[in-house]
């Protein structure tokens, strides 16, 4: 199979998993939001330890993950990891609080707005985006208006929580972008 086909199939798989996650989150509303975020974080952390050890093994075992000197992580890697983790925790917690009172589809749409919020953040960082990006931002704002705003031009509190989640997820992408070349 060609690399482009594999890449496309992997993107489709990731999108499907992401979409099903909202249904699972909605089903888990009986679990307190902070508890759910903590459990998700622990599961992800344990999985990442496994992935790190696997990649280390595939690369010849050059990186010492656990040694007497520490974890083999630089100061900047610690800062980047902690900052990304804190921002991600805030975003998922707001999302979980928001999904309690709104449906999964609406939560997914509002959360996905982070994609068009990132270029808006980019303006403040001196980054320019092409015209088609701004057209997409406009279309997304119109979609948000029709989906979430009432005739009195108000937003449900749960939708506001999910919108805050999208703003924080966009910040997460911005933080990752900041550290990607360094780490």
Q: What are the language-model segments listed below?
A:
Residues 19, 42-46, 117, 141, ...:
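Small-residue-rich packing faces within the transmembrane alpha-helices of Major Facilitator Superfamily
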Residues 28, 36, 40, 98, ...:
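Hydrophobic/aromatic residues within transmembrane alpha-helices
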Residues 1-35, 39, 85-86, 90, ...:
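Glycine-/small-residue-enriched transmembrane alpha-helix faces in small-molecule transporters
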Residues 96-102, 127, 148-157:
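Membrane-interface helix caps and helix-loop-helix hairpins in membrane proteins
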Residues 48-55, 95, 119-122, 144-148, ...:
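Structural signal for membrane-spanning alpha-helices in multi-pass inner-membrane proteins
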Residues 48, 129-149, 161, 165-169:
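Hydrophobic transmembrane alpha-helices of multi-pass small-molecule transport proteins
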Residues 47-52, 114-135:
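C-terminal transmembrane-helix exit sites in multi-pass transporters
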Residues 21-22, 53-111, 144-146:
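Specific transmembrane alpha-helical segments of multi-pass solute transporters/efflux pumps
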């Amino acid at each position: 199979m060609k690399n482009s086909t594999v890449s496309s199939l992997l993107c489709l798989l990731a999108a499907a998993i992401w979409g099903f996650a909202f249904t699972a989150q909605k089903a888990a509303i009986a679990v307190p939001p902070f508890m759910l975020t903590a459990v998700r974080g622990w599961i992800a952390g344990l999985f990442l330890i496994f992935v790190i050890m696997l990649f280390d093994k595939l690369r010849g075992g050059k990186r010492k993950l656990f040694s007497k000197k520490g974890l083999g992580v630089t100061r900047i890697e610690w800062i980047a990891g902690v900052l990304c983790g804190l921002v991600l925790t805030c975003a998922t917690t707001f999302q979980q609080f928001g999904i309690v009172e709104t449906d999964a589809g609406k939560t997914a749409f509002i959360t996905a707005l982070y994609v068009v919020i990132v270029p808006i953040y980019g303006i403040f960082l001196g980054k320019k985006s092409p015209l088609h990006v701004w057209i997409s931002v406009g279309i997304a704002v119109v979609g948000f208006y029709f989906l979430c705003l009432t005739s009195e031009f108000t937003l449900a509190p749960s939708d506001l929580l999910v919108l805050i989640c999208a703003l924080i997820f966009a910040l997460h992408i911005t933080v990752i972008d900041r550290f990607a070349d360094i780490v």
